[in-house]
Every structure is written in C-alpha cells, then in structure tokens.
C-alpha cells in the first residue's frame, strides 16, 4: 500500500505546485483578454498618459505655447485610453462594446476630420495633470491642487460646480438617432460615495422621462463619461422638435451638487429651424484660414456644436468669385483681398467641414451670385453682353457702364479707389450655366452642402442692348431677376441647399418664388426695412421684425437675420475698441432676443480663431461686429459667452413655441408694474424705456413676448458703445393683461389654468414655471387673461396652452414603469438613488406658483413607489396645489379611473414616439387615436428584473417619467402605447416613497443604461403602421391574459395639469415577455428567477386639487398600454407568435447560465462596480425607503404603476427585424447561451451601424471627393460621414473584450485555455509519477 500511495509531504508539494501553475495561467489569460480589449477599444478615445514623464513633457510644451494657444488647449476635451481602462487592476467600470459605445461622430477613425472632443493627442496630454499617477478606471480624474479640465461646451450651471462639462454628440439629430450625453462630473463632497447624474427630458411643459448614470467616487474625485454611458434612445423624440434636458448631479443622500440645462433638437431638415453660425479667417493671421490654427477652430466648433448650431456659413474661403474652391491647390492666395493678402489652406477648410458634418450640421459655401473679381488679373469669363449696366451713376460706377464695386485701398499714405468686382445680369442664361457649374464643382471639392449667396444690394440696371437708353421702361431692378436666377440654379444643383442675401429684406416679396431653401437677410439701420414710424427716431432692435412679418405673411420659410453689433467705424464703439473693451453683453442679447421673439434667428456666433475672442474669457466664440466678419475689434467676455450659450439652449428647447408656424396676434396685450402703471407703450418696440409687449399664437397655444427696454434706448446696433447703457432695469411682479376676444369664458378659464413663464436669463435658465392667472372681462364682456409674471430681466416668454382637456383625459392616468431599486447598501455601485431619495430635495422647494425659476414649473408634482425588484422603486404621487382651479381636472379623473381601454392607452400613448412601435427611422410614431388598442396587454413587470445590464459602478437609467400635459402637443402628441400593469407572478408589495421633482420615476438599468421609462408625452406624427405592429406584438404576448384587471386612476399632472392630452411619451418603458425573450439567453434566464413585484398605490394629497394617483391592481392588462424599450430586439416588426414557444425554451434552457453568471456580478460589486445583469436577484431585496411627506412641488401627473421594463441597448436600432434571429431554437441550448449573448450583442452593434447610415448627414463624408453631395437637400435622406465607416463592422469581436473583470478569467471552451489545462495536466501527471518513483525507491 505504501508503494502505491504518495506520502503526505509529496501530496502537499503537488497541490502547491498545481495552485501556482493555475494562478499563473489565469493571470496570463486575463492579461491576454485585457490586451484584446485594448486592441478593439473605442477608436474615439484619446491616449491620456498618466505617467510622470508625460506630465513633465506636457508642462514643457505649455511653456512654449502662446497665451492664445493655451486658452484653446483648455477648451479641448479628452477621452482616456481604452487600453488604460482594460488593464487597470482596479478599474471601476467595464468597457462597452465599441460598436455600441462610439457615437456616430467619433466612430470612424479613418475620417479626415476629427472633433476637439477626441482629436489631437498633443493637446489631450495637457489634461494629464488632472489624472492621478495610477488610473482608477476610464475617465476617472483625481482632484489636484491646480486642476485643469478640458471642456467641450460652455457650462452654465444653475447651482454648484459638480458638473465640469456637459456635451452631446451632435448639434442636431436626425429622426431615429440616439442622443449620447457626456457629463464630466466630480464628487464635491468630503466623503466617498455614489454620485449620480440625472437627465430629465422635457418637451415644453411635459416631462417625458428621466435617465441616469451612477459612479462610485472618492471625495474630490472626478469622472469623464465614456461614449454610451448616458444615452437617450431615439424613440424618446419626435422629428422637428426641440427638447430641454435638465441635468443634475446628486450624492448618495440625494443632495443636489449641480444643475445644468441643455437643449436637444431632432430635425430631419435644418431649414425648419436654422441656427446659423460663422466660420471665417483669423484676424490674427491677416484674415487667413490656415492649418496652423486647426486646433483653435476645432475647439470653437465643438463648443458651437454644444450651443446647437446646426448650420455654418463659411465666409470668404473662396479663391475668386468665378473659381471658388479649386481641387488642385493645397493653399491659395486671395488676390482680390488687396487690403490683407489673406490665404486659405484647403485641407483646413475640409477638416472643419467634416467636423461640422460629424456634429449633425451642414456647411454652406459663401460666394457672390453675380460677381467676378476684376483685380486678380483674370480675364472676364463671359462676354460683355452678359453684364448688368448702370441706369445712373449712384454708387456702382458710371451710367451705361457695367455695374461694379470699388473699395478704397491705402497706398503711399493715401487711399486709392480699386475696383474689385463686376456684376452679371441675373437673367443671363450663359451666366446661370457658368456659375452653377463652377459652384457645383467647388461644393464638391470642399464637401459643402449648399451655397450661401450674397448680393451687393439692389440697383436699377439695363441689359447690354439697352445700356445707352434713357427709356425708364427698359430698366429693371436686379432683385426682379433674383427669383428667375434662383430657380435656374436649383434646377441645375438640386442636391445642394441654396439661399441668397436680400439686403435689408427690401424686395423680399420678389423672392417668394425663388425656390430657395431658407430666407436670409442682412439687416441695416436704414432703408425700407424700417417701418415708417422710425423716421424720426434712431434705429432699434426691431429692424428685423418688419422683415420677419413679411416672411410670415408670405407663408415662407424661417428667416435668418444677420445684424452686426457695434462695429468700430466711428462713435463710442470705436473708442471702446481702441480702449480694448468688450462688447456690451445685454446689447447683444437684446438683439438676439428681439429677433428670436419675432420668429427668426440672429446669426451672430462665429468661429474665427481670433485672440480677441479668447483673452477676456470668451472661449473663442466670437460675435459678428461688422460686415467683414474676420474683423473683431471688441472682445467677447466670459459673461457674454456664457449667456449666449443660455440663449442658444433656450431658442433650441422652445423652437416649436417661438417659430413653428407661429403668427402675430393682433389682440391687445399690455404690461403693468406692481403699482398698476402701464409699462408697454407700443407693440413695435420703436421707443425705449418700456416693456416691449406683443402676443403670438400657434397651434393650440399662445405666447406673450416681453422684452425689457426699461431705462435704455432702442438702438439695436449700439454704435455708441459703452457710452450708452444697454442694461435695462430689472422688473418684478409684473401683470400682463391679454384680451382674448371671442374666446368663451370656459375656454378662457382653461387657458388660465395652463399658463407658464420661462426665460433664458439667469433667474430662470429655460425652466418653465407655472404662474397664477385669472380671467376678467372688459367693457364688452369679453374675457381678459390677467397673468402674474414674477421677474423680467431681458426677455420672458409667457406660454399659454389652450388645448381642450376633455380631448385628452389620459394625461392624468398614465402609469409609471418600474423604478430602479434603491438598495444601494446591498449593491453600492448599482444605479444610484432613484426618485424616492430625490424627494428629499424636492420637499424643501417652494410651491409651483411661486416665482422661483427652478424646476418648479416643469417638474411639478411627480411621484412613484418603490418595488422590491432590483432597480425598481416608485414613490407616491403628491398633489399640485396650483392645479386646484383646473376646470377639467375632475372630469379627467373620472375618465381616467374608468376601465375603458382607450383611456388607458391614451394615458401612456404619449411616451416615446417611436420606441413602442419600432418604426423605421423615417417613420413617424403612432397617433393617440391608434393608442386606443384594448389588446395591448403585455405584462411588463416580469420583464424588468433582468434589465440590469449596467457595467460595474456605472449605470444609466432612463427613468420612467409621466409626462405632463401641454397645449400644443395635446393635439399632436401621438405616441405608442405605454407599459401595462405587472403580472401577478412578477409583483410583490412595496412601501411607497416620496419622489424627486425632476427624477421622480422608477429606473431600470440596462447595459450601462438604466431604463427609467418616461411617462412622457412627446407630440408625434400619426403612424398607423407602428400602432398595428405594437398591437400585434402585445396581443401575442404569452402571459398577457394572466394579468388581472387593474384600473388606472387619474393623477395630478405636471405643469399642464388641466390639459392631460399629451403626456404619455413613455421613453424606454416596460416590455412584454416577447420583448424580454428577444434579449440574450443569460438575461432571459435571469428574468425567470427574479422576485415578483407588486405595485402599491400612489396617492395624491386630497387638498392638492389634483386627481388621484393610480392604484395597483386596478388596471386590466388587456386595456393597459405597453411600451417597448428601445432595444434592437424590441424593434422587430415581425410577428412574434411563431417564436413564442422557442423563446420560452430559451428562457428555461439558459437559466443555469444566468445563475452561473450571477456570481460574476457579486464579484463586480465587491470591486466597487455597478450591478451587472446577473446581479439582479442578489439586489432584489429593496431598501425600504422612508415614506416622505408629499411635496406640492412634486410631479404627480407623471405617476404610473410599478412596471419593470427592459433596458435600452446602447445604439439600439429602430427598425431591424433581423434581430429576431436570436430567438431561434438553435440558440436555446444552455451550453451555447454565452455565445448567443455575444452574438446578439455583436448583431446589435452591426445593425445599429446600418441604421445610423440611413439617418445621418452628410452623405459619405469620409470620402473627401464625395463629402457635401447629399442625395437631396433634405438632410434626413443623406448618409452620415463618420458613423457609417465600414471598418466599424469589423468590431463585433470587441464585445468579448468588454466584459467585466470576472469574465477575464479562463473560460471553458476557449481553445487556449483548453491547451493550457492539458499541458498542466500532463505536467501534474509527470510530477506525480516522478515523486511516486522516488518514494518507491
């Protein structure tokens, strides 16, 4: 026996030997996986070295950089290296699939243009001082004594400094594109804890949803979000709409550390709401645009992107008027520019164009429409018969000679007249053919999307045949030929945008039939653009209003207005320039406000790489001062840039209120101070020292525009400079009286209950606040709306919804999908505190009717109650006192509690325009009418548990928010049905908890997204097809019939309580079993094991005057609408019944795999990461939140039943039915579940890439010779440049490398691991034999 067995010491030796080999092999294999991750990581990431050597190198470089360059460097943003992320032993988060992670604008490494957010490594290293010597994971920044953080945007915080930078990946999104937010934030507290970023989505007065992302940070530690960390699905938005995102950072105790508002616009055609910026030469380099300034331009364009500029005017980057942008010259000199000798680097221009495209904007090449240069030595391109000839000698040359333009050029101490341009007849066929050909080539060479035409102004001329005639009947105005010219150019260049400058709008009516894509006017303080009443007064801020009125009366397109501030030619502005002063902030803002209030857009912001725009904190963002754009005599201050950013966010967020078919209202509107003194003297704003007041009306709403001119004059150009004060006296407690005319008293009372005020100024920062309003009568018995306005700094907009509440009672009965678990003690890094904890902040806020500018007006009274499921919690709804007088509230409540399926579905139909029907990217969401589908009964609660797919220590949570009512959207809001009630087996009782004002709905994590479906109401376009698909999917849901009837009760609404029609845009909301089964096997199996959740009642305080919150167990699943999250799987439009059996098998077969993987999640939690999908059950024990007192400021209208909902997959597609392939029986084998999951994720990445190709603009921008050649002038139909790179499709393998650290250990089935095990086994057997032989001897 002794000869056959080893001795005890030998056995111990073998055991130790085996352990050493196994650990070494495991480490080797994990390192190999980490290396693979580094190879396939997001190409948009910039290497950020954290070594001391890199810091020293950076510091030495900074000493050599000029002050202007240093300023620019600080404006660049950085993304940490993916390799650093994967190899960091204590990485606090895991990588996402690069295919899902990389936003369109940064996904193509081969694209010739790069943005400031992820471009030059040299400048990226300047931020290494923000990082510790040892990385704590991607994006983690250690606070230092002299921390410098690169920024991509102009951050204008309402409170706190926890938000360092806030950026979106595009200035304007095409329909069907996801919104990727990037928030750089830090833990400003003195303790280590979870810090959470919340993003609330609003459309006017309707809260559509809340999304959130959590990170565990040490005291003073910062985090730079990675691409895909915080994503809002395309289904949340409707085409041609502006939205307001309220971004907040909170600590684990739910204390708000910082708040910032940002606008998002979804526009398939930029000409619907143009926001025009300028790119021009730098005054620092003789008005040249050179490659050496490329970094400054990148940083400026990046900031303007985040100011939502969706179109750019490339000024004076042409060689000559008749050869604008040659393809064979790397650099050309502008010989016609004799006063500065400027040069243009063509590649620098192309790079900027590509960056513009990457940001979702278009690039317009500037050139004269009739000119040729005469001082360049070039011969005339056409015979003299094609010129326009002067009918007199008033400014354009001698009578009978070709019309020309002359400038004075300094020479030998004197000024010499030099002719630089001559003009052709716009009706000349030869000229039309010639210039169309040349401009077509130029736009193709530079990648431009259109032609910004310019004119020298109007003039009476003769044709060549009549040039010597004195017959008045033979002469004509140049503008009379513009329409013919423009039509001819559009016929020859149909795929390019076209607009022309009609100076001062003098002959705008003649251009009505010119077929131009957008109206552009350069306004001057003289000429017929001024109303006759101004003859005796100085020109003022309203010079654009007559032009805009003409545009609206002619039913034309939106107008862009060029109005140049101050200048330095003479007067006080010249003295200011010589003294090195800055532009007057309020003078610029009032001009922009007056134009926006009238329905236009002030073209003023410019990227000019000019030191004047940097030295006073302007961050490189210039403001146009003269007709020659590179001239920047006055500085732009940090205050002006910050406030310009606020105004751009406001104009974008409320674009539908300001200029979406809005007309002037001739009704009498007056403003009075608190003493009853009338402050509004004339509606045309001709005189100063008044509150310029006038009304406007749109589709189911009205507005009152209030512009403060108290104590100042009305000279908009401000040629007197700082000598003329432009800061008006701030007004408080104003009363606005609005005569409603023939409106009935009932309608007038309804409007009074739906009255709000907002402003871009600091007191409001775009937050919509409900204000008190009452109805009185005039001497004729007609109703007069009396409105209290709390404050007026420069510009206020009073918004009055006149939508009929009776038509949309569903607003008060929407359900809130399941919320995210608040059990942060169990899972420290799980998606952080949900709405229940948010209530702490809200309970201390004033009532909605107060004059506070914060979220009171928008996120009023919303609540939810927690669920026992992981990531789920809902708090009880609180009432909104302001809604007590709503005449239709009770009626809406009665309808809400009824078991009518129509009401149930309409209540939720306003959420997520497209997510629920999964239409193609160009399809519109379903209508409210379609939402009345009684068969939509998918049991969504049981699908929730597995929705946690967030990487360790991070999570993004679309929080289910109940939308509030709104005026205009009420009739237009057509959405897919929202989530239905939970099934019995997926519910369990929970305690209610108060919710936060802005993040008051449940949350469900998904990937690094937590779906907190919005109880929203995004107005949408009818889509019968989408509804039918949703119905089909819901009726085929297996467990749907088991759901007990639950009658949903009405709820108090957000700012538009009285008008509940359009509240239901439930962003990523609860899913059906079918949708659940379309997820990866691991997730499906996990869902089967999740604990059940029961929804508790959310009650509204009786004295709130609002309807009751919905009660659990009262909504019949057959009548309750459901909402599908925006995952590729849920976007399948194919029938689901054929695959139900297979999907059930998949759930059962993969349960074992899910249980095995669950151990990985717990490991991740121990390392300080957010809960992974497998962690769901472990965290299902909810942290019973305290029941907090109801806050009258809490959103109650958005209250819905607890419904777990499946997460939104990053970069989800909206219309790819091929994702159903993952449901085939072949994929149900538990042994293959991991491969199936990986395959699903890879397929999602590939499908999302294909989806983006069809929705992005510009067309094939990666090829320089193809950039700027859109298939049509409609942006929606043109492909994107960067996001559609073919190389991207080769990245599916990267999904393997993005797993958590626990997945990096050797895995059974890996061929290298198998070989390693075999070798170790052989070594072990050999050693055993040797020891046995030795002991035998």
Curated annotation (Swiss-Prot):
Residues 52-140, 806-1310 are annotated as: Disordered. The modification Pentaglycyl murein peptidoglycan amidated threonine is found at residue 1308. Its EC number is 3.2.1.11. It is a peptidoglycan-anchor. Keywords: Cell wall, Glycosidase, Hydrolase, Peptidoglycan-anchor, Plasmid, Repeat, Secreted, Signal. Residues 1-30 form the signal peptide. A motif (LPXTG sorting signal) lies at residues 1305-1309. It is found in: Secreted, Cell wall. One of its GO terms (cellular component) is extracellular region. It catalyses: Endohydrolysis of (1->6)-alpha-D-glucosidic linkages in dextran. It is an enzyme of class 3 (hydrolase). Optimum pH is 5.3. Homodimer. May play a role in sucrose-independent adherence to the pellicle-coated tooth surface. This is Dextranase. It comes from Streptococcus downei.
């Amino acid at each position: 026996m002794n000869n056959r067995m080893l001795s005890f010491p030998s056995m111990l030796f073998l055991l130790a030997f085996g352990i050493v080999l196994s650990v070494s092999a495991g480490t080797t294999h994990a390192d190999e996986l980490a290396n693979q991750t580094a190879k396939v990581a997001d190409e948009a990431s910039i290497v950020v070295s954290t070594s001391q050597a890199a810091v020293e190198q950076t510091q030495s470089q900074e000493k050599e950089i000029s002050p202007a360059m240093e300023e620019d460097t600080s404006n660049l943003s950085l993304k940490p290296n993916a390799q650093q992320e994967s190899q960091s032993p204590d990485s606090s988060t895991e990588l996402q699939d690069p295919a899902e992670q990389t936003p369109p604008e940064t996904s193509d490494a081969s694209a010739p243009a790069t943005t400031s957010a992820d471009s030059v490594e040299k400048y990226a290293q300047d931020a290494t001082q923000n990082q510790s010597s040892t990385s704590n994971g991607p994006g983690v920044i250690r606070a230092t004594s002299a921390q410098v953080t690169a920024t991509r945007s102009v951050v204008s915080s309402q409170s706190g400094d926890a938000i360092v930078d806030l950026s979106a990946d595009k200035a304007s999104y095409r329909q069907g594109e996801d919104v990727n937010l990037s928030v750089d934030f830090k833990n400003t507290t003195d303790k280590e804890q979870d810090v959470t970023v919340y993003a609330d989505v609003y459309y006017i007065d309707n809260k559509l949803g809340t999304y959130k992302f959590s990170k565990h940070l040490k005291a003073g530690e910062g985090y730079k979000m990675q691409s895909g960390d915080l994503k809002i699905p395309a289904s949340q938005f409707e085409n041609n709409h502006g939205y307001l995102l309220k971004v907040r950072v909170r600590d684990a105790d739910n204390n708000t550390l910082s708040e910032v508002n940002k606008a998002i616009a979804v526009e398939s055609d930029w000409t619907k709401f143009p926001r025009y910026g300028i790119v021009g030469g730098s005054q620092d380099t003789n008005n040249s645009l050179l490659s050496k300034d490329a970094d400054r331009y990148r940083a400026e364009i990046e900031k303007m992107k985040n100011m939502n500029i969706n179109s750019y005017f490339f000024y004076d980057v042409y060689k000559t008027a008749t050869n604008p942008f040659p393809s064979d010259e790397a650099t050309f000199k502008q010989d016609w520019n004799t006063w500065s000798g400027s040069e243009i680097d063509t590649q620098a221009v192309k790079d900027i164009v590509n960056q513009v495209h990457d940001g979702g904007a278009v690039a317009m090449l500037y050139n004269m429409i009739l000119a040729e240069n005469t001082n360049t030595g070039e011969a005339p391109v056409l015979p003299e018969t094609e010129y326009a000839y002067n009918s007199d000698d008033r400014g354009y040359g001698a009578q009978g000679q070709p019309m020309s333009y002359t400038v004075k050029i300094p020479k030998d101490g004197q000024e010499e007249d030099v002719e630089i341009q001559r003009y052709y007849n716009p009706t000349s066929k030869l000229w039309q053919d010639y210039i169309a050909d040349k401009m077509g080539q130029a736009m193709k060479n530079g990648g431009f999307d259109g032609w910004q035409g310019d004119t020298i102004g109007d003039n009476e001329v003769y044709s060549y045949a009549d040039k010597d005639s004195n017959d008045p009947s033979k002469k004509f105005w140049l503008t009379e030929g513009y329409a013919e010219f423009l039509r001819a150019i559009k016929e020859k260049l149909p795929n390019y945008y076209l607009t022309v400058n009609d100076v001062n709008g003098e002959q705008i009516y003649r251009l009505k039939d010119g077929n131009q894509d957008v109206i552009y006017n350069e306004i001057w303080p003289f000429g017929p653009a001024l109303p006759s009443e101004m003859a005796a007064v100085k020109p003022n801020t309203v010079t654009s209003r007559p032009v805009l009125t003409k545009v609206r009366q002619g039913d034309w397109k939106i107008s862009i207005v060029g109005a140049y501030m101050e200048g330095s030619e003479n007067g006080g502005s010249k003295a200011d320039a010589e003294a090195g002063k800055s532009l007057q902030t309020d003078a610029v803002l009032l001009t922009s406000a007056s134009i926006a209030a009238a329905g236009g857009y002030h073209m003023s912001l410019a990227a000019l790489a000019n030191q004047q725009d940097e030295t006073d904190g302007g961050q490189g963002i210039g403001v146009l001062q003269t007709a020659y754009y590179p001239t920047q005599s006055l500085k732009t201050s940090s205050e002006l840039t910050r406030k310009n950013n606020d105004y751009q966010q406001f104009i974008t967020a409320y674009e539908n209120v300001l200029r979406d078919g809005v007309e002037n209202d001739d009704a009498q509107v007056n403003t009075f101070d608190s003493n009853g003194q009338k402050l509004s003297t004339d509606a045309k704003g001709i005189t100063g020292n008044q509150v310029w007041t006038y009304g406007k009306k749109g589709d189911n709403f009205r507005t009152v525009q209030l512009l403060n001119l108290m104590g100042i004059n009305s000279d908009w150009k401000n040629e007197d400079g700082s000598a003329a004060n432009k800061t008006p006296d701030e007004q408080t407690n104003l009363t606005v009286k609005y005569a409603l005319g023939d409106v009935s008293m009932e309608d007038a009372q309804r409007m009074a209950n739906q009255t709000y005020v907002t402003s871009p100024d600091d007191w409001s920062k775009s937050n919509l606040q409900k204000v008190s309003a009452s109805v009185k009568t005039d001497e004729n018995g007609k109703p007069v709306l009396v409105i209290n306005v709390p404050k007026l700094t420069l510009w206020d907009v009073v918004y009055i919804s006149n939508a009929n509440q009776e038509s949309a009672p569903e607003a008060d009965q929407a359900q809130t999908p399941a919320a995210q678990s608040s059990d942060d003690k169990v899972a420290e890094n799980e998606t952080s505190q949900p709405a229940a904890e948010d209530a702490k902040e809200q309970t201390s806020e004033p009532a909605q009717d107060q004059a506070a500018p914060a979220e009171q007006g928008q996120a009023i009274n919303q609540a939810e109650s927690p669920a026992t499921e992981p990531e789920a919690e809902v708090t009880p709804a609180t009432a909104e006192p302001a809604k007590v007088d709503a005449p239709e509230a009770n009626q809406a409540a009665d309808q809400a509690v009824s078991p009518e399926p129509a009401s149930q579905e309409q209540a939720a139909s306003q959420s997520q325009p497209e997510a629920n029907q999964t239409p193609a990217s160009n399809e519109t969401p379903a209508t409210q009418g379609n939402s009345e589908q009684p068969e939509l009964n998918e049991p969504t609660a049981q699908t929730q548990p597995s929705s946690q797919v967030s990487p360790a220590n991070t999570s993004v949570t679309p929080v289910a928010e109940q939308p509030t009512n709104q005026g205009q959207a009420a009739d237009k809001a057509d959405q897919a049905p929202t989530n239905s009630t939970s099934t019995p087996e997926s519910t369990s009782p929970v305690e209610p908890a108060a919710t936060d004002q802005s993040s008051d709905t449940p949350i469900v994590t998904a990937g690094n997204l937590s779906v907190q479906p919005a109880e929203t109401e995004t107005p949408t376009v009818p889509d019968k097809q989408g509804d039918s698909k949703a119905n089909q999917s819901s009726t085929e849901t297996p467990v749907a019939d088991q759901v007990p009837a639950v009658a949903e009760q009405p709820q108090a609404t957000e700012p538009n309580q009285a008008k509940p029609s359009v509240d239901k845009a439930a962003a990523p909301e609860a899913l059906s079993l079918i949708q659940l089964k379309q997820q990866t096997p691991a997730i499906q199996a996990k869902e089967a094991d999740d604990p059940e959740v029961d929804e508790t009642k959310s009650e509204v305080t009786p004295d709130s005057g609002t309807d009751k919150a919905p009660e659990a167990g009262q909504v019949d699943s057959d009548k309750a609408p459901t909402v599908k999250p925006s995952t590729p799987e849920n976007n399948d439009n194919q029938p689901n019944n054929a695959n139900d059996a297979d999907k059930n098998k998949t759930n059962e077969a993969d349960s074992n795999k899910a249980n095995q993987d669950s151990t990985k999640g717990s490991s991740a939690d121990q390392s300080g990461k957010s809960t992974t999908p497998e962690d769901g059950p472990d965290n299902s024990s909810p942290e019973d939140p305290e029941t907090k007192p109801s806050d009258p400021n809490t959103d109650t209208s958005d209250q819905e039943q607890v419904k777990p909902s499946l997460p939104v997959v990053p970069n989800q597609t909206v219309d790819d039915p091929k994702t159903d392939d993952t449901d085939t029986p072949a994929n149900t084998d538990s042994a293959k579940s991991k491969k199936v999951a990986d395959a699903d994720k890879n397929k999602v990445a590939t499908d999302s890439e294909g989806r983006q190709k069809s929705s992005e603009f510009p067309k094939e921008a990666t090829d320089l010779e193809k950039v700027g050649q859109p298939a049509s002038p409609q942006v929606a139909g043109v492909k994107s440049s960067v996001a559609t790179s073919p190389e991207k499709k080769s990245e599916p393998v990267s999904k393997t490398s993005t797993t958590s650290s626990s997945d990096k250990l050797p895995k059974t089935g890996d061929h290298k691991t198998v070989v390693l095990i075999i070798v170790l086994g052989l070594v072990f057997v050999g050693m055993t034999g040797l020891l046995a032989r030795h002991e035998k001897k």
